[in-house]
Design a protein with these regions (language model features):
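Glycan-recognition and catalytic cores of secretory/periplasmic carbohydrate-active enzymes
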Residues: 1-161
Length: 161
């Protein structure tokens, strides 16, 4: 970590929160580039795999777990940049989620983003986080971003400082 040497070439869906962190820390240009990379991971198979070897551009963990991180980063970048491409990114991701994960009774994980084979499970964070970030991305006036902070489960807490 302190040498700057690359120790791996895997990027996963759980790492996709980091563009938002970079943007909130003021490094918007790096955040933009990393979000573009995360979105390329999404578009490679039409939905985000759990992990990808970005050197080989091959999926190393093919499941899709309905995670919020990439949508959260799009929302944060949309706020800080007002660039409409993040809303468009969100529209594509939402459309893909509905297309591939919708069931008669809700949504489900995918066993494989390559084959689009559906699982039989819906994580609670789909409702608590993923869909909430989509809503906020598409309707930013619903919440004053600068007057709240989000806890780890995407619950907005009013800032008093």
């Amino acid at each position: 970590m302190t040498t700057g040497q690359r120790t791996g070439t895997t990027f996963g869906s759980l790492h996709a929160f980091f563009p938002g962190v970079l943007a909130m820390g003021g490094d918007v240009e790096r955040a933009r580039r990393l979000q573009e990379s995360a979105f390329r991971m999404w578009t490679l198979h039409g939905i985000e795999p759990e992990a990808l070897d970005y050197r080989k551009m091959t999926v190393t963990r093919a499941g899709y777990q309905l995670r919020p991180e990439i949508v959260e980063s799009a929302y944060i970048l949309s706020h800080y940049t007002t660039d409409p491409k993040y809303v468009e990114m969100g529209r594509r991701m939402f459309s893909d989620l509905v297309k591939h994960c919708r069931t008669e009774a809700g949504y489900t994980v995918l066993k494989s983003v390559i084959t689009k084979e559906k699982g039989d499970f819906q994580h609670s964070f789909l409702l608590a986080e993923t869909l909430k970030y989509f809503y906020l991305l598409f309707k930013p006036e619903a919440l004053d971003f600068d007057k709240v902070t989000f806890n780890t489960e995407a619950h907005p807490l009013r800032r008093t400082w």
